[in-house]
Amino acid sequence: MDIKRTILWVIFSMSLVLLYDNWQRSQGHASMFFPSTTQQAASAPAASGAAAQGDVPKANVAPGAAGTAAPAAPQAAAQPTGEKVVVTTDTVRAEIDTAGGIVSRLELLKEHEKDGKPVVLFERDNVRTYMARSGLIGGDLPNHTTVFTAAPGPRTLDGAEQLEVALTAEKNGVKLVKTYVFRKGSYVVDTKFAVTNAGAAPVSPTLYLELARDGSKVEQSQFYSTFTGPAVYTDADKYHKIDFEDIAKGKATVPAAANNGWVAMVQHYFASAWIPQTGKEHSFYVQQIDPHLYRVGVQQPLGELAPGATVTTDARLFAGPQEEHMLEKIAPGLELVKDYGWLTILAKPLFWLLEKLHGFLGNWGWSIIALTVLIKLVFFPLSAASYKSMGKMKDLQPRMTSIRERYKNDPQKMNQEMMGLYKTEKVNPLGGCLPIVIQIPVFIALYWVLLSSVEMRGAPWLGWIHDLSVPDPFYILPIVMAVSMFVQTKLNPTPPDPVQAKVMMIMPLVFSVMFFFFPAGLVLYWVVNNILSIAQQWQINRMLGKGKAAVVAKS
């Protein structure tokens, strides 16, 4: 069996396995490759109210120590009750629970689900737990289990540029004033902390900022899986993703103490992050709170406070979509939460170019088409070489068939004759494959660009395509892709082996069924690429035909 036949059989076999796996998922069975969100949600319910609200972190063992936080101190079983302060801006609707002063719910008003409702990022109910918490440790001090008092004030912007929600709590002579500042058009909530020692003895509090989340994915994948979990960034250690599984097994590590960086929770299209004050020494921690709840956080020592003294610090809480340019302006490295996979070095320039095209064309669908044309032009010399090689191989098919028939009982002699034929005619049997292989990394990088870019979410193209991030609802693009692949097989040399020929005929159907489950934006790229390839191949075949006719005329 030659190399091409082996490659085809591998592709064909993988396609059948993936199709069977997708059918299994559609019947409610477990996937062989990807985790099922439904199953995770069923087997991993949200943490109980006491657990989700009650676990206060301990101070890290030593400043600068890398690793997970020490186990939390035992907490009282009773869960505090408070009021819900609902804040509405033009971008978010946030719910602040005065029991702990936590952001317990956050809706993104400019991002919508399929039913038209806003995307809910932070949430705390019987199904999901995801919230932003903060407080003081270093004694029995105000923390996210303490009931705060909310100061009166506006709760909607109503034409203003910003609004503030001040929360106050006092415990054991230490008063904490936590102020959330919401701004117009922003997904960043500035958070101010003022700590006053109203007691008679010095105290040394440490501020903690953390994101607590259950370990389930928000949405189920079909043929792809995106990262969900904590991440930590420092200038020294750069971007560091942490798997929930590693946290549960005690294998997770975090960077050493730094005076910069941030902690985040990442999911497909969206992220949240606590960004502490730059220039202040702080340490990081990750921890499994209970079997279904995890947290990532940062601790900042505030120093010793004498009686009557006050110390202030601030931080920023980001919660929103992974829009790359917006993230770049918020904090160094925050754009890295947008996961391009292992081909980031190729994906980032592709997205930059795609965004420039969108700025000119105003439609992401047409921008994908324009980008496909540009990529095709860049790879035109390689593609032309590939088609010319395939054309030469097509001309040699009769002689190759004759050699196979003549030496069918002597494989070694047959291979020698084949190599001699290739050498005489100056043909590389892999010449048609190599240019295609070189283009594969670009295709994979573009795949991740289209998969990871929240800009595609809810972006229409034309007609029936109302969202480029979801599959074509009427399967028109996959069908067009199948037709284009079928036409391509007709332009390629017919394989001499009957089995290989049948595989080539079946492949368009297999790929079209696979692409039923891919985002419409990615299928659009593939369709346009195929159509351009057909036009290019037809033109090159036509030129080769003219060249042969000229040779015959001269002879």
Curated annotation (Swiss-Prot):
MF (Gene Ontology): membrane insertase activity
Keywords: Cell inner membrane, Cell membrane, Chaperone, Membrane, Protein transport, Transmembrane, Transmembrane helix, Transport
GO CC term (a single one): plasma membrane
GO biological process: protein insertion into membrane; protein transport
Subunit structure: Interacts with the Sec translocase complex via SecD. Specifically interacts with transmembrane segments of nascent integral membrane proteins during membrane integration.
Functional description taken from the UniProt entry: Required for the insertion and/or proper folding and/or complex formation of integral membrane proteins into the membrane. Involved in integration of membrane proteins that insert both dependently and independently of the Sec translocase complex, as well as at least some lipoproteins. Aids folding of multispanning membrane proteins.
Name used for this protein in its record: Membrane protein insertase YidC
Origin species: Cupriavidus necator (strain ATCC 17699 / DSM 428 / KCTC 22496 / NCIMB 10442 / H16 / Stanier 337) (Ralstonia eutropha)
